[in-house]
C-alpha cells in the first residue's frame, strides 16, 4: 500500500539528478558534541541516500594521518608502561604496536580509559565516573564546569551505593584523544573500596569536609543551577549508607534491575542447551574438508544416503506442552537388549542381519588402525545397538557409530 501511494505522489522523481535527498537528509546528533555557540552538532553524512547508488566515494572517511600517528605514538608509550608492570594487555605474542584499528582510542579493547561517557539520566547504572587525583573531591567540586578537562581525567569505577554521576558540563566538549592520553592517563588500577567500610558510617576525613565547605561557600556566590547540582552530589553522599536500608527510596528502575539479577542467579544451574541425545542434523559438506572415513560404506551423517531419513536416527520423542508424546516411537531407548537378536549382534559380519552392510576385514584398518593390532583383532569384543533394525543408518541416540566395547 505504502509503495503504491509513494509512486502516485512522486510520479516523475529522477533519483540520479535530484537534489532532494541531499538537502533534506536525516540529521543525527550525539548528546554532547556542540558548536562554539553551544548548539548540538549535526552529522549530515549519515542516513543519506547517494545520488548515484554505485558511487561509494562520498562514504569514505578522509584519512587523518596526523591523528593516526598520534595514536600510534601513544600506543607504543603505554605498552612500554605495561611492560614495566609485567602486564601484557595483549595476549598475542605477535602483537604489532604500529597496527591501529579503525576508530581506535589507542588501546586494545578492554583496556585503558573508557571514552563512551553516558548522559546524566543514566546515573542508575552500576558504574560512576570519579576522578583519580589525590584531591579528588576538591577537583570534582571546583572544576565541574571546566570544559578543558581531558576525558582521561575521569575513569569508570564500580559504584559503592552512591548515585553520583558527572555533571554534563564536566564532560569535555571536543578533545583529540591522542594528545590527552599521553599527558593524563594514569596507568595505576584504582583499588575498589570495600563494602564493609561503606556500610559503617564513619566521621568524614578533615580534607573532605574542608573541600565540601569550600564548595558550599563557592556555591553561595554562584548561580542557582550550580548549587542545585552540588546539593545533588551532597545528597548522594548522605544516601550512601541509607540506600541499603531503605529500598523503597530507590527508584523503580533499580528495583527491576536487582530483580532481574536475582532471577538470573536462580536460573544459573539449569541447562538451556540441547542434551547430547537430541537429534544431530546431518553435517553439511564443507568444501576443502577431508571426508569422514567411510565406516559402514555409508556414513551415518551422509545426507546422500537413501536410508538417511528412514526414522531411526530421529531423537527421542519430544514432549508437547501438555507433557504428552507427540508421536510414539516404538524403538525409543534400547540400551542393548542382550537377548534380542535384532539389537544385539556379536558377529561383525552383518550380511546375515542386514543392519549395516559392512566389511569386517577392513574394519580395524579404517577405524582402529592406531589402537589394535590387525593380526590380533577379535570381533567378539564389539557389540552393536541399533534403534530400528530395518534401517541402514545407526541410531543417533548413541552417537555417529553405534560401536561400544563389550567389556
Curated annotation (Swiss-Prot):
<feature type="region of interest" description="Disordered">
    <location>
        <begin position="314"/>
        <end position="341"/>
    </location>
</feature>
<feature type="region of interest" description="Disordered">
    <location>
        <begin position="1"/>
        <end position="64"/>
    </location>
</feature>
<feature type="compositionally biased region" description="Basic residues">
    <location>
        <begin position="232"/>
        <end position="246"/>
    </location>
</feature>
<feature type="region of interest" description="Disordered">
    <location>
        <begin position="110"/>
        <end position="276"/>
    </location>
</feature>
<protein>
    <recommendedName>
        <fullName>Uncharacterized protein L645</fullName>
    </recommendedName>
</protein>
<feature type="compositionally biased region" description="Polar residues">
    <location>
        <begin position="184"/>
        <end position="201"/>
    </location>
</feature>
<feature type="compositionally biased region" description="Low complexity">
    <location>
        <begin position="209"/>
        <end position="231"/>
    </location>
</feature>
<feature type="compositionally biased region" description="Basic residues">
    <location>
        <begin position="259"/>
        <end position="270"/>
    </location>
</feature>
<feature type="compositionally biased region" description="Basic residues">
    <location>
        <begin position="316"/>
        <end position="341"/>
    </location>
</feature>
<feature type="compositionally biased region" description="Basic and acidic residues">
    <location>
        <begin position="33"/>
        <end position="44"/>
    </location>
</feature>
<feature type="compositionally biased region" description="Basic and acidic residues">
    <location>
        <begin position="247"/>
        <end position="258"/>
    </location>
</feature>
<feature type="compositionally biased region" description="Polar residues">
    <location>
        <begin position="138"/>
        <end position="147"/>
    </location>
</feature>
<feature type="compositionally biased region" description="Polar residues">
    <location>
        <begin position="7"/>
        <end position="32"/>
    </location>
</feature>
<feature type="compositionally biased region" description="Acidic residues">
    <location>
        <begin position="122"/>
        <end position="137"/>
    </location>
</feature>
Amino acid at each position: 500500500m505504502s509503495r503504491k501511494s509513494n509512486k502516485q505522489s512522486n510520479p516523475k522523481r529522477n533519483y540520479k539528478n535530484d537534489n532532494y535527498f541531499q538537502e533534506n537528509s536525516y540529521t543525527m546528533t550525539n548528546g554532547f558534541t556542540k558548536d562554539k555557540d553551544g548548539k548540538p552538532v549535526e552529522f549530515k553524512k549519515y542516513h543519506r541516500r547517494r545520488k548515484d547508488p554505485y558511487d561509494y566515494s562520498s562514504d569514505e572517511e578522509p584519512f587523518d594521518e596526523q591523528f593516526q600517528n598520534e595514536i600510534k605514538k601513544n600506543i607504543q608509550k603505554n605498552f612500554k608502561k605495561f611492560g614495566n608492570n609485567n602486564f601484557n594487555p595483549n595476549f598475542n605474542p605477535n602483537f604489532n604496536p604500529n597496527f591501529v584499528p579503525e576508530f581506535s582510542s589507542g588501546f586494545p579493547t578492554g583496556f585503558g580509559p573508557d571514552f563512551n561517557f553516558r548522559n546524566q539520566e543514566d546515573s542508575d547504572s552500576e558504574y560512576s565516573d570519579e576522578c583519580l587525583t589525590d584531591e579528588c573531591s576538591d577537583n570534582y567540586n571546583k572544576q565541574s564546569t571546566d570544559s578543558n578537562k581531558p576525558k582521561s581525567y575521569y575513569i569508570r569505577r564500580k559504584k559503592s551505593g552512591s548515585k553520583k554521576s558527572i555533571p554534563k558540563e564536566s564532560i569535555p566538549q571536543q578533545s583529540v584523544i591522542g594528545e590527552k592520553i599521553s599527558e593524563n592517563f594514569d596507568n595505576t588500577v584504582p583499588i575498589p573500596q570495600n563494602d564493609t567500610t561503606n556500610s559503617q558510617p564513619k566521621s568524614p576525613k578533615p580534607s573532605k569536609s574542608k573541600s565540601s565547605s569550600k564548595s558550599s561557600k563557592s556555591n553561595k556566590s554562584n548561580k542557582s543551577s550550580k548549587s542545585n547540582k552540588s546539593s545533588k552530589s551532597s545528597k548522594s553522599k548522605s544516601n550512601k549508607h541509607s540506600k541499603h536500608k531503605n529500598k523503597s527510596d530507590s527508584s523503580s528502575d533499580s528495583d527491576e534491575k536487582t530483580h532481574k539479577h536475582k532471577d538470573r542467579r536462580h536460573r544459573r544451574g539449569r541447562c538451556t542447551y540441547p542434551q547430547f541425545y537430541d537429534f544431530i542434523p546431518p553435517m553439511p559438506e564443507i568444501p576443502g574438508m577431508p571426508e569422514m572415513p567411510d565406516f559402514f560404506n555409508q556414513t551415518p551423517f551422509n545426507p546422500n544416503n537413501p536410508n538417511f531419513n528412514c526414522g531411526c536416527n530421529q531423537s527421542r520423542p519430544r514432549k508437547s506442552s501438555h507433557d504428552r508424546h507427540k508421536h510414539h516411537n516404538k524403538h525409543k531407548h534400547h540400551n542393548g537388549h542382550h537377548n534380542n537378536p535384532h539389537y544385539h549382534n556379536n558377529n561383525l559380519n552383518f550380511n546375515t542381519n542386514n543392519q549395516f552392510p559392512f566389511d569386517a576385514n577392513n574394519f580395524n584398518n579404517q577405524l582402529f588402525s592406531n589402537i589394535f593390532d590387525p593380526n590380533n583383532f577379535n570381533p567378539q569384543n564389539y557389540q552393536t545397538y541399533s534403534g530400528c533394525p530395518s534401517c541402514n543408518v545407526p541410531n543417533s541416540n548413541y552417537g555417529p557409530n553405534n560401536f561400544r566395547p563389550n567389556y
